[in-house]
Amino acid sequence: MRKLSFLDRVIEELDSYARFTKVPLNPSKKSPSSDTIDGKLSEIEKKHSAGLMRVDYTGEICAQGLYRGQASVAKSPQTKEHLYHAAAEEYDHLAWCGERLQELGARPSLLNPFWYWTSFGIGAVAGSISDSLSYGFVVETEKQVMKHLDSHLKSLPVNDNRSREILKQMYIDESEHAVEAEKAGGKKLPKTVKAIMKLQSKVMTTLAYRF
């Protein structure tokens, strides 16, 4: 098997990004909301739910970018495989959120290309330093995503049963991903790096909710 050139990798990532942003996506697992019936939502409630799900969709776009960026420069084959596997599992979350956005009559954030490639760059930089730092970013990312999911579960309209089932399953999965990354040797990130990640996350959630 020939080694991929830099150009080959660029083309591969562009193709992957094109697949991630194509709606609807084809998840490997059916949505947790498949057998759930919604209560009646007012237009205001529907708009709020759409904003929250748009944020969660963008969060999954960021996860795809981060993991694929890390995997593209991973030091060991095991780390590379672990990260691509994590990205594949996050793909289901992306598909579920995209499907729910369609049900709510909403679209993904217009800024997703920016967030994907920014996350890809951060992942590539972290991954080029060391695998342990790369796993550290996974741990911190998953913990921040879990905080968002928890706040969204509390903020969802009472009757938005379908969105709630999706976010509950995502929370469980993200928790498992964080534990797996810690077991793989995730290095604890400096407080400054965590603060920057939180700031970036705050900007992303604010913009994605509206745009």
Swiss-Prot record:
Fe cation 1 binds at E60, E90, H93, E174. It is found in: Cell membrane. Pathway: Cofactor biosynthesis; ubiquinone biosynthesis. GO terms for biological process: ubiquinone biosynthetic process. Catalyzes the hydroxylation of 2-nonaprenyl-3-methyl-6-methoxy-1,4-benzoquinol during ubiquinone biosynthesis. InterPro entries: COQ7_proteobact, Ferritin-like, Ferritin-like_SF, Ubq_synth_Coq7. Its cofactor is Fe cation. Belongs to the COQ7 family. The gene is coq7. Its EC number is 1.14.99.60. It comes from the Bacteria. It catalyses: a 5-methoxy-2-methyl-3-(all-trans-polyprenyl)benzene-1,4-diol + AH2 + O2 = a 3-demethylubiquinol + A + H2O. GO terms for cellular component: plasma membrane. This is 3-demethoxyubiquinol 3-hydroxylase. One of its GO terms (molecular function) is 3-demethoxyubiquinol 3-hydroxylase activity. It is a peripheral membrane protein. Fe cation 2 binds at E90, E142, E174, H177. Keywords: Cell membrane, Iron, Membrane, Metal-binding, Monooxygenase, Oxidoreductase, Ubiquinone biosynthesis. It comes from Francisella tularensis subsp. tularensis (strain SCHU S4 / Schu 4). Binds 2 iron ions per subunit.
